From Swiss-Prot:
Protein name: Regulatory protein SdiA
DNA-binding region positions on the chain: 197-216
One GO BP: positive regulation of DNA-templated transcription initiation
TM spans (from-to): none
GN (gene name): sdiA
Keywords annotated in UniProt: Activator, Cell cycle, Cell division, DNA-binding, Transcription, Transcription regulation
Biological classification of the source: Bacteria, Pseudomonadati, Pseudomonadota, Gammaproteobacteria, Enterobacterales
Comment field on protein domains: Binding to the autoinducer occurs via the N-terminal 170 residues; as E.coli does not produce LuxI autoinducers endogenously it should be able to bind to a number of different AI-1 autoinducers, which would enable it to detect other bacteria. This was shown to be the case.
Amino acid sequence: MQDKDFFSWRRTMLLRFQRMETAEEVYHEIELQAQQLEYDYYSLCVRHPVPFTRPKVAFYTNYPEAWVSYYQAKNFLAIDPVLNPENFSQGHLMWNDDLFSEAQPLWEAARAHGLRRGVTQYLMLPNRALGFLSFSRCSAREIPILSDELQLKMQLLVRESLMALMRLNDEIVMTPEMNFSKREKEILRWTAEGKTSAEIAMILSISENTVNFHQKNMQKKINAPNKTQVACYAAATGLI
């Protein structure tokens, strides 16, 4: 790939994603780009930071229905190494036997369903959600695409597709809505630091009743049982 070819492609992609008005346009473009890179399927998976004990995971894909159903039935999400950010030490992640060494049932099932080669790129969103873009193919043969070219293109595709979906307020990328005032965020920051209501009142030069009022109001806004959960969610999603 010549530099001018990549930068021409990059300009085209940036314009396309900026002009998209629906999520369907985003997914259609991802599918088209996967095909141009000689891959048969794509999957865009978003893992949210909350709830902590059962994080919200959403995905959109053109995988065969049989594979999606089998994957979900076997709860492969819990062991899938391509959705573990710790594995991305060198940019994009190529699927191979070593990667799936601790998830052999998943790897064997994927190949049995026709997924013999794949690659994944991930990105952290401003709301701390993790987005994983995967391309996979049925053929086991090597593809004539340089690793650097593939990585650069997938980096742009995962970034621009997720940013477009955020701009469109698509549910796949949106975390729980937390519309807090400036004062509420101030109180949240001190709550996250472990300060009591009385201590926060002294720091901000307001009454303790005012602090408690704001904390209760924030709990109502996100249906949280206590102020600790509000502060934890706000920190986990990058609000404070």
